[in-house]
Amino acid sequence: MRASLDTNVIIHFYKANLQNILFDFFDEGVFIYEQIRNVELENHGQDVISKVDSDIAAGRIEIYTNQKLKDLQVYKIFEHNVNENRNLYGSGDLGEVYAISLAQTLGAYSLVTDDTKQGGPYMSL
């Protein structure tokens, strides 16, 4: 099974040193959108970012960039999903918007998020 990760769960799993649960359970891949690594984790996850970067370098986490999505010929679908999810969930938590949009675009069955609000993105796949 494959999974798209939201920023906060990355931070929670790594702070608890339980990130291997993600890699064991989602044996077909764990992935994030570049904005989650380059903006959200830079701003909110400084204490775990070196461990995350190690797992990215080791191929345990795959980063999807705009260019990679274009190369896969799914960038426009991703862009549409981002716009739709921004309308649904607002721009307050862009990590959440990008995580769900990436899962939808790539056909992942799992979104790992700590969101619990009624009608939140966990209900979107």
Predicted regions and their residues:
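Active-site-proximal, substrate-binding regions of enzyme catalytic domains
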Residues: 1-109, 116-125
